[in-house]
Amino acid sequence: MSGKANTSKKKSQRVKRNVKQRADKEDEELDSPENKVGNRAKRNRSHAGHLSSKEQTKCVHLKRVKISSNKRTAWQPLPKNTEEYLQSMMDSAILGILNKNIKRKEQIQYHLDQLKKRFLQQCATLKVPPGKLNYLRDMSKLLKVEREQERANEESLASLQEEIDKIVETTESMTENIESLKTKIEILTNEVEKEEEEMKEVFHIDSNKVLALPELSQKSLKAPILQKEILTLIPNQNALLKDLDVLQNSAPGKNMAAFIQEAYMKLNGS
């Protein structure tokens, strides 16, 4: 009877130890960040059940991953170059935010600095799997490449600034030339106006641009015609007129007149 009692006690103690180990293991898994993520995923899934179809598409579904404690023992702290890279990225992001035209910059800067400080403190104590850090081993090289790219960008910006300065100088010189040409045009316009006024005074041109010529005298209107003056010099005027009429109506005279007319026509046509 005593042997059976001892064996039953041993079995009960063994069962208690197994139950306790299982409970401790479950507590560790529940306290681990992966299980926290899983619990969040469960809460997200339960919350997504109450959302509409459009809102459910926007929800991020987190996948629960179980990692044994043996694997977590091989994890290593985050490398320093990775921390430096993350710090530089956060600094550039903060500068990009503060460069914008926003209100309460000092409060925002203080808040962002505190977030950066807390984040870097978490990174200092963070342990990650060594296999996952293969892509982070070349952070120094990446930083070097980025710095070289930054230098190249600065040089290109400097060259662009020089070109812009040259263009500004040429535009300024062109503006000066245009202004000088405008002054010359104004001077020439004034000179032309003065010359026009002088011409009006010389030629007596009125506002209607009509040339004010002097009036003819009455003597010039009553003066005899040149033909009459010539005829007065000839004693036998009637006989001369008859002879001229005979010559004009004769065949040789008509031929001569036709010849002269044809010659004029050819000259006008040429």
Curated annotation (Swiss-Prot):
The keyword Coiled coil belongs to this UniProt entry's keyword annotation: yes
Keywords: Centromere, Chromosome, Coiled coil, Nucleus, Phosphoprotein
Record PTM Phosphoserine, positions in chain: 52
GO cellular component terms given for this protein: inner kinetochore; nucleus
Post-translation changes: Phosphorylation at Ser-52 is essential for CENPE recruitment to kinetochores and orderly chromosome congression.
InterPro entries in the record: CAD_CENP-Q
Region (Disordered): 1-59
Cell cycle in keyword set: no
Coiled-coil spans in chain: 143-205
Biased composition (Basic residues): 7-20, 39-48
Database matches in Pfam families: CENP-Q
Complexes and interactors: Component of the CENPA-CAD complex, composed of CENPI, CENPK, CENPL, CENPO, CENPP, CENPQ, CENPR and CENPS. The CENPA-CAD complex interacts with the CENPA-NAC complex, at least composed of CENPA, CENPC, CENPH, CENPM, CENPN, CENPT and CENPU.
Protein name stated in the entry: Centromere protein Q
